[in-house]
Amino acid sequence: MRFAISIPQFFGDGEFSPADFRAYFERAEAFGVYESAWAQEMTLGPSPQLAPLEAMTYAAACTSSLRLGCTVFVTTLHSPVQLAKDLATLDQVSGGRVEAGVGSGGPRRPFAAYGIPADRYLARFTEGIRLVKALWTEPSVTFDGEFWQLKGVAMEPKPYQKPHPRLWFGGSAEAAVRRGVRLCDGFFGAGSSPTAAFAAQVATARAVVADRGQRVGFGPGEFPIAKRVYIAIDPSDGSRARQRINDALARMYGHRVPAIESAAIAGTLGECAEAVRAVIDAGAEMVLFTPLFEVPEHMEQIATELIPQLA
């Protein structure tokens, strides 16, 4: 079983401390129980949030072994050429520690703010992933797509990891999960997916993986499955933990989102351990813990008190 912790991108009080940011990564790595740290992407919105790629790069400079990822980059809003270059660069300077989560973002993303037409976003997503992989693996790329065209171009350096960093797909609808398994190297359940819904997504992913002649797992050639978990622990008052995480989610999204609130895990230590075990039983081989308040304190409590109960 593997465990990960979120990169603390949110600072609801508007105050950001670079020193605290560095200390967080150093402390997370020192615990030795977190394999990786993950950002998420929300460029526009009501809550102050650091950009994922830059936060990952800073984290790489503060650590030596912690793997670094984003779940997910909304790749329909990115140039695949620039994203391929940026992630290859970070993989080089971090010594091969990059994990890349990708997703289409859905039809309600602010495409107009990026000067991108909203129609054909799924085709744009699929084509973009194909182009990223080509730039990462081929010495010279000729690509004649609907959205991007390249003729005999090279992108160097390639990523440090060979053939390339693992591409995780993030999505929830059955068709999206099937598409993601075909395109990517791992499935990452969203923090907004309740455990029962995640279990159904895992079943879909496993079926497609089996049809492709693969196995689920973290071994060579295998297809891993993970899940983000929004979490709040209160040693003495589980209802207070629930209220606080619901308030934090409302600040992050700008309004109450009952579906996401129902997917979050909150309560006493014992209640949280039981709920996380259910996520593991549903098929998660890695759990990404995402506290939204008192983040350094939660990171330490999860490492020293919660994870030992799950081992």
Where are these regions (language model features)?
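Acidic (Asp/Glu)-rich catalytic clusters
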Residues: E26-A30, M56-S65, L87-V98, V181-R182, ...
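Active-site mouth loops of central-metabolism enzymes
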Residues: I5-A19, F73-V81, Q161-S172, A232, ...
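Hydrophobic faces of well-ordered beta-strands that scaffold small-molecule active sites
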Residues: F3-I7, E35-A39, L68-T71, V98-V102, ...
